[in-house]
Structure formats: structure tokens, C-alpha cells
Regions:
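A glycine-rich helix N-cap at a beta->alpha junction
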Residues: 58-66, 107-118, 198-202, 469-480, ...
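Short beta-alpha connecting loops at secondary-structure transitions
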Residues: 59-60, 118-123, 139-144, 294, ...
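Thiamine diphosphate
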Residues: 1-149, 177, 242-243, 269, 412-547, 555-559, ...
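Flexible, low-complexity linker and terminal segments
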Residues: 2-21, 25, 146-380, 385-386, ...
Length: 627
């Protein structure tokens, strides 16, 4: 991440290379947003991280909330007393927040409020690739879709203005390629954030008992009609190219970039309608575009969101126009990312144009290069305490136990040789699915979860286990950070998103407060002690909690190096029989094979000592450890 203090520069017209997420952070400063809330999740994490780093200097408030629903509720409270707010989350986070968002559409806001929802086509870092544009339809909230970092900034500013004009939250739907693309962004003028609001009581609007909800639903539908006018006149809904061959392309978001490149590659000369405000759609503008063309090609990622609505518009405005997309011969896939190649192949198929590139040759060249490259599957880092925890868990539970798992670094425990993880659905699901497994199988069941995810979503499931006396064990892998998304703080870390000290919320006290009778904390590197405690937990009737506590190695190493401590790696002595136990049991990337013999990669070893604990011949010796 670059020096983010550049975001604080009040230099209008300055051009800077920024990630899409950093561009949104800059927009927060330009639009005078006073409160920013988030729960970290790729591909949206850098929005909150960027603001966290500069929040004090920017004189605004930022927090890493316990989960996305809390983040929305905190921001909604601010927006309803007149303070501009923004909440950032990944796409599945909107599932968590949906209960609040759906009713907030009825309540509305008084200060501008933007909800950034970052979709992840191709599931690069997610458990699904849902298309959150449908949340805009479902909630009747306006939705903007940027296609570049510059638009990410500009549309955030526009979203605030639309929000205040309609008195509604506005969804800013990004995708991974927009969030994580770095491009030139032109700065505007900074605005002073307003952190001082005032509650103007309006019980009918703000308290959603049934009688009020019925009335406010009517008001919401009136706002939708007003939003249609905004969409028709939005500068982000525009014909960017006018062709002469009566072929029209309609696209949005990152897919628009592929459509333009593919059309240029084929020399198609098509007209292109770019849609940046995609809920509500500009029906009149689209109808006019349909009438001006004989063939319409809709290029969008994931679901046929635009296509379905445009086909409905065509029935009224241009019933004879030919529309090509995902539902007509499936020219475009309903899964994964698009690419210039995929779009070019579809356009060629539809129009009969010839692609000037032999993609088969590029495939062959790629395959030739790739065959000599080592595989790099995602694995736990060398020295990761989760590896020690998994070794203990698998040694105790063996093949007889069931292992529902959760969202976080520890999901990588499914990989060999650890092979821990039987069912993964969503944040916090492990403890609840464990109860169903336990009751249905009668077998030992150990649910795996991390510390941040525990606070995010596990507590209701744990209460359920206590209430219904479920005999399950919850293994909390506590590495004192939200590691997978970038080491953000959480309620158990003792620091806030503002960098201020905070009360550490104790996982063990929370578990005890929920009524769990068996709660113990272990050091996963003390293998024998940890195994004994886990065995005891499995013999307990009712829910039990074992907290495997050891700091994330990356954070720990950073702190030790900052203090000038030296890491002296382990070494393989001549006692080694090459039994391969360390490799077969742990899969640590610091254990490598050279000439058929186990060696320690000194550039990766962090001297955690786990390999020495499992070696039956005491062949792995400390070179001095962490000094």
C-alpha cells in the first residue's frame, strides 16, 4: 500500500495512481463524510484500511464494526441525525446487513449515506459470486456501478448527492477488478467533515412498526419514481460511441472495458451505451437506443440483471430488436469474470466478424510456460499457529470426528496434509452446523472458528448450543487479528480503527457468559498440553470451548524485527532418518526436499519449533530460536 497521506492533499486537479478502493477513500474526504464504518472483507478491505490510517488527520470517525449489520446500523444512526456516512463491505457482507438495509430503505436518511458492496466475480476470495445488483432491485435503493478508479471516486460523490436528494441510502456496487485496479485519479477539493448531527424526531418516518411501515413503503415508491428521473439524466448513463451498422452494445461496470476493447479488436463499429446508474434503469434512454439498432448485445458479469430488464423494456419500445446476452444461446457465461477474449469471441459469434488474434496459439504458449512453473496453492504461512492447532485437533479427533469450519485463514486447513474442514457455509456457520452434524451422526464434532469471526457471527450459535445442550466442541483459533483480510483490529485486540486503545473483549468470558461450562485456553505450540485439554473437552457433555491462542506469525515477526530480535531458523541434524513425518504431518512450506532429503528453508523458517515437536527422532534442532 502506498503512502496514504497523499489522500489528505487538498490539491484539486492533481493526478495520482490509486486503487479503486483508495479512490473511494479519497471521495470520502472530498464529500465531507463524517462517519465511516466497515467490516473488512476482500475486495473491499482497503477502503476501511485507507481511512483508518488517516482518520485522525482527516478529522472524521472510522470504525471496524463487529459485523456488517452493526456497521450499517451505526452509520444509519449517524445519517438519520444529518451526518454523512459510508459503509464498506464485500458482497456477502450485504447478506449479513440485509435485515437492516431492507427496512432502512423505508426509514430513509437525512444525511447522505453510501453503502459500498464489492462483488467478487470468479470467487477470488469468497465463498460465492452472488450478484448484489439484485439487492438494489429488492430494496428499491439506487445503485451506481463504476468501471474505473476515477469513476469509483466520482460516483461516490454522486451517490452522496443522490442520497440526500432522495433521502435514501445509495448502493455503490463495485467488483474486484474495479476495487483492485490501479489507475489515474484526478483529485477534487477536500471538504470539511461534519461530525455534529441533531435528532429531529419523526416517529412515523423513523420507527417501523407495521402502521408506519405501510405508510413509508408508499413514500419509498414515490422516491423510486423520482430516482427514475435522476437515472434518465445521469451523466453516468450515456452513449459513449455512435456506430453506423445498427449494432448496439449495452454494458456496465468492469464489463464495459472488456466490451470496448473487444469491439475495437474486431473493428465492430458498434454503438455503445454505458450504464453507470443501474437501479433504476433509464427506460426512455434505453428504449431510444434499442430503436436505433437492429441487434443489441448486452455485456455484463454474473447474472442477466440488465438483460432481463432490457428485454422487458424492449417489449414496449422496440419489440422487433434482436437481443443477445446470457439467456439467448448463452453467448456470455453466468459465472466468473468476463475478459476481452470472452467478449470478443461472443461478439464474433453474433456478428460474423473474424478475430484477428489466434487465441489457440496464445493458449499453447501459456501452457508451455506454465508447465515448468511450480504450483502455488494457497497455504498457511510458515510458522502459522493454526498449523499447530490443526495438528492437535486432527491428532485428537482423528478420522472419526467431524470438522465444520469457518471463514478465515483457517479455511486453508482443508488442504493436505492437515485435511481439517468438512463443511463451510458462511461467517459463524461452523458452531451451528456442528450442532446439526452432532445430533444427526452421534459422532464427535469439533467446529473451527477464528477470533474475528467469533465476534462477527458465532455468539448466537454458541448460545443455541448452550440452550439446546448440544455436545459439540468449538475450537477458537485466536491469533489476535483479522489476518486474512490484512490484519485489521477486532473487539479482542484492544485497539480501534482510529488507532486508539480499547477494552479487550475476552473470548473466554464471552463463552462463559453464554453459559458454556467448559472453557479453556491453550497454547497450540505446547502440543501435549493442548491435546490433553482437547481430549477433555470432547469427553464433556454439552458445549465446550477450547481457545488455541497464539499471535499471527506475520504480525509477531514484524513486531520482533522492529524490536531488533533475531530469528535463528531450525536445522536438520544427522539424526534424521528421512522418515518424512514432519513433511507428511505438517505441510509447512519451510520444510523442503533437497536431493530427496528434508531440509529447512532458512528464508521461511520462523523458529516456531512445531516440526521439532512432531519429529520422532528429535532430528530437528533449534539454531537458537527467536533471540
Amino acid at each position: 500500500m502506498p503512502n496514504l497521506r497523499i489522500l489528505l492533499k487538498d490539491e484539486p486537479n492533481k493526478r495520482v495512481l490509486l486503487l479503486g478502493n483508495e479512490a473511494i477513500a479519497r471521495a470520502i474526504l472530498e464529500t465531507g463524510i463524517g462517519i465511516v464504518t466497515t467490516y473488512p472483507g476482500t475486495p473491499a478491505s482497503e477502503i476501511g484500511d485507507s481511512i483508518s490510517e488517516i482518520a485522525k488527520d482527516a478529522n472524521l470517525y472510522m470504525e471496524y464494526s463487529t459485523n456488517e449489520m452493526v456497521a450499517v446500523e451505526v452509520a444509519a444512526g449517524a445519517a438519520n441525525v444529518g451526518v454523512r456516512a459510508l459503509t464498506a463491505m464485500k458482497h456477502v457482507g450485504l447478506n449479513v446487513a440485509a435485515d437492516a438495509v431492507m427496512t432502512l430503505a423505508y426509514v430513509g436518511v437525512k444525511g447522505g449515506y453510501v453503502i459500498v458492496t464489492a462483488d467478487d466475480p470468479e470467487c477470488y476470495s469468497s465463498q460465492n459470486e452472488q450478484d448484489n445488483r439484485y439487492y438494489a432491485l429488492l430494496s428499491n435503493l439506487p445503485c451506481l456501478e463504476p468501471s474505473s478508479p476515477q469513476e469509483a471516486k466520482d460516483m461516490t460523490l454522486a451517490a452522496i448527492e443522490i442520497s440526500e436528494e432522495l433521502e435514501l441510502p445509495v448502493l455503490l456496487r463495485t467488483t474486484t477488478r474495479v476495487n483492485h485496479t490501479r489507475g489515474p485519479v484526478t483529485f477534487g477539493k477536500l471538504s470539511k467533515p461534519n461530525l455534529k448531527g441533531k435528532l429531529v424526531r419523526d416517529v412515523k418516518r423513523m420507527v417501523m412498526v407495521p402502521a408506519h411501515a405501510r405508510l413509508m413503503h408508499v413514500e419509498l415508491l414515490k422516491k423510486v419514481e423520482k430516482a427514475k428521473g435522476i437515472s434518465e439524466n445521469s451523466p453516468y448513463n450515456t452513449v459513449t460511441r455512435k456506430g453506423k451498422n445498427q449494432i448496439g452494445i449495452i454494458s456496465s461496470s468492469a464489463a464495459y472495458n472488456y466490451a470496448v476493447e473487444a469491439a475495437d479488436l474486431l473493428g465492430l463499429g458498434a454503438s455503445i451505451l454505458k450504464l453507470g446508474m443501474t437501479n433504476p434503469l433509464p427506460e426512455k434512454m434505453i428504449g431510444q437506443f434499442l430503436r436505433a439498432n437492429k441487434k443489441i448485445i448486452i455485456v455484463e458479469e454474473l447474472e442477466p440483471y440488465l438483460e432481463t430488464q432490457i428485454k422487458a423494456i424492449a417489449k414496449d419500445h422496440a419489440p422487433t430488436v434482436e437481443i443477445y446476452g446470457k439467456t439467448t444461446r448463452q453467448y456470455f457465461p453466468r459465472k466468473g469474470e468476463l475478459s476481452t477474449r470472452l467478449v470478443a469471441e461472443a461478439l464474433a459469434d453474433i456478428t460474423g466478424k473474424k478475430i484477428p488474434i489466434d487465441f489457440k496459439k496464445t493458449d499453447e504458449a501459456y501452457a508451455e510456460i506454465a508447465k515448468d512453473l511450480p504450483a502455488r496453492p494457497p497455504i498457511l504461512c510458515a510458522g502459522c499457529p493454526h498449523r499447530a492447532s490443526f495438528f492437535v485437533i486432527k491428532r485428537v479427533g482423528g478420522e472419526k470426528a467431524n470438522y465444520p469450519t469457518d471463514i478465515g485463514c483457517y479455511a486453508l486447513g482443508i488442504a493436505p496434509p492437515l485435511n481439517v474442514g468438512d463443511l463451510l457455509v458462511c461467517m459463524g456457520s461452523g458452531i451451528s452446523t456442528a450442532q446439526g452434524m452432532s445430533r444427526a451422526t452421534g459422532e464427535p464434532t469439533i467446529a473451527i472458528i477464528g477470533d474475528s469471526t467469533f465476534f462477527h457471527a458465532a455468539i448466537p450459535g454458541l448460545v443455541n448450543a448452550v440452550y439446546n445442550n448440544a455436545t459439540v466442541t468449538l475450537a477458537v483459533l485466536d491469533n489476535s487479528t483479522t489476518a486474512m483480510t490484512g490484519h485489521q483490529p477486532h473487539p479482542g485486540t484492544g485497539i480501534t480503527g482510529m488507532g486508539s486503545p480499547a477494552e479487550k473483549v475476552s473470548i473466554e468470558k464471552v463463552a462463559e457468559g453464554c453459559g458454556v461450562k467448559f472453557v479453556k485456553v491453550v497454547d497450540p505450540y505446547k502440543v501435549e498440553e493442548a491435546q490433553a485439554v482437547l481430549k477433555e473437552a470432547l469427553q464433556h457433555t454439552g458445549p465446550s470451548v477450547v481457545i488455541f491462542r497464539s499471535p499471527c506469525t506475520l504480525v509477531d515477526l514484524r513486531e520482533k524485527r522492529h524490536k531488533g530480535m533475531k530469528i535463528v531458523p531450525y536445522r536438520v541434524s544427522d539424526k534424521c532418518t528421512n522418515c518424512m513425518a514432519c513433511v507428511k504431518l505438517l505441510g509447512c512450506p519451510a520444510l523442503i526436499l533437497e536431493d530427496g532429503k528434508v531440509q529447512v528453508d532458512e528464508t521461511l523458517c520462523v523458529a516456531c519449533g512445531l516440526c521439532a515437536s512432531v519429529c520422532p527422532y528429535n532430528a530437528l534442532e533449534s539454531g537458537g530460536g527467536q533471540q
